[in-house]
């Protein structure tokens, strides 16, 4: 999973054409995320501090006390907005109804973590308990899944104590810094997740070490281009067939993203960019781009209406505290979906509002 999106910035000059470019650029950015060395950041969004419930045995809270706290917590009535219309991945079972130690368990938890921006830590724990119970109620795997969730939360709580939440700081691909970040996160996963560290992060860590070695080879000034190519080929030969296929798909996506970015820099129209997206990333991606464009144009229209009312309030000569409170109330009433009010506030700051 990924980190929380940064709010968009800009001024009141935002118009539908800018919205079209914003939407298309957003799709390009989403594709580009896959082309980055993903392990420069922690692998999933970091939950808020979990408190007694999330700490669990892995964080030093007795299991009995943790279970009592969980039982007392009310369950959320409905899925939060980020998960509306979706279903949690299936939790895998092994023989005897026990929880299978596979990455699918992490994918289940990462699905729930998608909603963390809308929920308090207690509500997030309640959501996870409800989703676990929906699949495993009364089985031995239910208690196991709750225990693994507590460990996973403890992992993120500890990760938040590292500089930059365990991310590589700075803009350069510094192999030493990357190695340190990888080692720190691996040690932390072993300490908090125990036997679950391998199914949760094992494949990812091996890919990360492979990526790191590629960077080291590319940065080695003592090697000729031919020597670098030979070493990279030898390194890639160590990959499994599935890993090689994934790498080839990633390279193809990188090429597509580069072409689309070049079009954007050259001032291509939204229609031209959508055509390129359809050609390089497929018709489904082009359809998503069109929908993103429509959604963003609708948002820009709402923002412009809001900005006019905001400016009217600002012109009334109110005391700064009263003016800001009125504008904040207007913003919250106008932008109700998660993240919208933050984006509007950022645009206000860019416009000097």
Swiss-Prot record:
Description of how the protein assembles with itself and partners: Monomer. Interacts with lipase (lip).
Organism field: Burkholderia plantarii
Subcellular location: Cell inner membrane
Positions in the Periplasmic compartment: 41-353
Designated name of the protein: Lipase-specific foldase
Family annotation (NCBIfam families): PRK01294.1-1
HAMAP family: Lipase_chap
GO terms, molecular function: unfolded protein binding
Transmembrane segments: 20-40
């Amino acid at each position: 999973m990924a980190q929380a999106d940064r709010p968009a910035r800009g001024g009141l000059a935002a118009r539908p054409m800018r919205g079209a470019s914003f939407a298309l650029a957003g799709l390009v950015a989403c594709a580009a995320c896959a082309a980055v060395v993903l392990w420069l950041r922690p692998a999933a969004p970091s939950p808020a501090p979990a408190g007694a419930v999330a700490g669990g045995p892995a964080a030093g809270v007795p299991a009995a006390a943790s279970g009592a706290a969980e039982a007392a917590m009310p369950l959320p009535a409905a899925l939060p907005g980020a998960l509306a219309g979706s279903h949690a991945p299936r939790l895998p079972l092994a023989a005897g109804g026990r929880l299978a130690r596979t990455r699918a368990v992490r994918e289940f938890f990462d699905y729930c973590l998608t909603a963390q921006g809308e929920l308090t830590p207690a509500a997030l724990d309640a959501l996870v308990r409800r989703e676990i119970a929906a699949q495993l109620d009364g089985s031995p795997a239910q208690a196991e899944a709750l225990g693994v969730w507590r460990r996973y939360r403890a992992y993120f709580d500890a990760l938040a104590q590292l500089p930059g939440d365990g991310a590589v700081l700075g803009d350069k691909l510094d192999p030493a810094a990357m190695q340190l970040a990888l080692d720190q996160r691996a040690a932390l996963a072993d300490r908090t997740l125990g036997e679950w560290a391998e199914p949760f992060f094992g494949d990812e860590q091996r890919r990360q070490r492979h990526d790191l070695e590629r960077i080291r080879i590319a940065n080695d000034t003592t090697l000729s281009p031919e020597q670098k190519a030979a070493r990279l080929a030898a390194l890639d030969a160590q990959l499994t067939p599935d890993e090689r296929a994934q790498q080839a798909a990633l390279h193809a996506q990188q090429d597509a993203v580069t072409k689309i970015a070049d079009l954007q820099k050259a001032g291509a129209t939204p229609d031209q960019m959508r055509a390129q997206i359809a050609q390089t990333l497929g018709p489904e991606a082009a359809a998503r781009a069109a929908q993103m464009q429509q959604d963003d144009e609708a948002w820009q229209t709402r923002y412009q209406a809001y900005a006019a009312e905001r400016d009217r309030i600002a012109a009334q000569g109110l005391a700064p505290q009263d003016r800001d409170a009125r504008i904040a109330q207007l913003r919250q009433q106008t932008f109700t979906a998660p993240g919208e009010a933050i984006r509007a506030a950022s645009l206000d700051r860019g416009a000097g509002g």
